[in-house]
From Swiss-Prot:
It catalyses: cytidine(34) in elongator tRNA(Met) + acetate + ATP = N(4)-acetylcytidine(34) in elongator tRNA(Met) + AMP + diphosphate. Its EC number is 6.3.4.-. HAMAP family: TmcAL (MF_01539). This is tRNA(Met) cytidine acetate ligase. One of its GO terms (molecular function) is ligase activity, forming carbon-nitrogen bonds. Its main location: cytoplasm.
Length: 423
């Protein structure tokens, strides 16, 4: 049995995603296709434009059989943490045979070579990165120059690593090595606009450009499948979107005005005096843009700052985050499936080394049931299972506060049933 896995955000699902999915299926010829998808918050440290159930529906209507949620504690990390959580989810299901990712270079041998070097020489490479960071460089630039020195190669070769999808590709392969997984990896050449292209540019426009167009009320119909367009239209009409970081500007500023430095000392990622920068900035800034720009320094990227905003709001304690980055995801949360996907889930429940959660209300019962099966070699920690799950619930409850329509802002989104699509 061949099972294709793709790591996605679908924020929102657009023509480029459909091209990637069709190409991946053509390459692998799978019996089932699953997507592991960011929930209500995405890797760049921003809320998704519509909620995770709406985006799961987009995926199911366009060829995905099962959508699983990447736990929030991984979805809001840098490329390495994001990949470790995403690949871990697929690996622990025990059935995924192939992963396909998009890449600007599409040079799988180069990506594999870099991944292997970084995996096998992580301590030496980390030392070089720290040395570059001390020069005041941002992490991406420090990583680039450290790699150039480590490989003793020219900067033009290393420039490939400035592409976001190539960086993620390297981290996916590294994660496969870390888990000692048998998952095969493949690459597809990315088509159309760059990942972070701000403006609409032809049929294959970036998700960033599409979100910007939505913000400025431009027509996006030609850049997304019809099903995506209709789902977005329905969510917007009901006041459940579009959701942007600015929607919760006052909430974010008040959160950091209420905090003291000691509140941030135990939060994952708050090092190098960032705790003071956040507190000071909250007190002198009048809006979110000012807040982020006042924190920004040469070595801190905007994405890192945005992620840290939510690390603090969701209370991502260092010890639990480090534990998470050692053990990987502790459960597989199902957001939706097709009737074909239901067949896959029946197989997965027999092979998975982590609990599969289709109904969050039954989380504790599911835990008791899996622990009764002592013959299976389980790969999760009960304390971490509960902690990661609680962060997903909290993230959803905060996310609904971003909704334009106040009547839609109730908590408890996660306790709905998963989406089931016929066919």
């Amino acid at each position: 049995m061949k099972v294709l896995g793709v790591v996605v955000e679908y924020n929102p699902f657009h023509n480029g995603h459909l091209y990637h999915l069709k190409s991946a299926k053509k390459l692998v010829k799978p019996d089932f296709t699953i997507a592991v998808m960011s929930g209500n918050f995405c890797q760049r440290g921003e809320p998704a434009i519509v909620n995770k159930f709406a985006r799961a529906k987009m995926a199911l209507l366009n060829g995905i059989d099962v959508v699983l949620e990447i736990p929030t504690v991984y979805a809001l990390q840098d490329a390495g943490g994001f990949a470790f959580g995403s690949v871990g989810l697929m690996h622990k299901l025990g059935l995924v045979t192939d992963i396909v990712f998009g890449s600007e270079s599409a040079d799988i041998s180069f990506l594999e070579k870099i991944s292997k070097i970084l995996y096998e020489n992580s301590k030496e490479f980390d030392y070089l990165i720290k040395r570059e960071l001390k020069k005041g460089l941002s992490y991406p630039n420090a990583r680039k120059f450290a790699l150039q020195k480590f490989l003793k190669t020219d900067l033009d070769t290393i420039k490939k690593l400035e592409n976001s999808n190539d960086i993620l590709g390297i981290e996916y392969i590294k994660a496969i090595f870390k888990y000692n997984s048998n998952i095969k990896y493949h690459v597809i050449k990315r088509v159309g606009a760059k990942y972070n292209e701000q403006n609409l540019s032809g049929k294959f426009s970036s998700a960033t450009a599409i979100r910007n167009a939505i913000k400025f009320e431009k027509n996006i119909k030609e850049y997304v499948p019809e099903s995506t367009y209709l789902i977005l239209k329905d969510e917007f009409e009901k006041g459940r979107g579009p959701v942007f970081l600015e929607n919760l500007e006052q909430f974010i500023l008040s959160e950091f005005r209420l905090k003291a430095r000691e509140n941030l000392e135990n939060i994952y990622g708050f090092s190098e005096g960032l705790d003071k920068r956040f507190i000071d900035s909250a007190n002198i800034s009048t809006n979110l843009k000012e807040f982020i720009e006042n924190i920004k320094a040469k070595r801190f990227t905007f994405s890192r700052i945005r992620r840290l905003i939510f690390h603090a709001i969701f209370n991502f304690e260092k010890n639990y985050m480090e534990f998470s980055n050692k053990l990987g995801p502790q459960y597989a949360r199902v957001l939706g499936f097709t009737t074909k996907g239901q067949e896959f889930l029946s197989y997965a429940k027999k092979k998975s080394t982590i609990p599969i959660i289709t109904n969050p209300s039954l989380k504790n019962k599911i835990l008791k049931d899996v622990l009764k099966n002592s013959e299976r070699k389980w790969d999760f920690n009960i304390s971490l299972y509960n902690w990661q799950f609680e962060k997903d619930i909290l993230a959803s409850n905060i996310y609904t506060l971003f909704y334009p329509n106040s009547s839609q802002r109730k908590s408890g989104m996660d306790f709905r049933k998963p989406i089931i699509i016929e066919g």
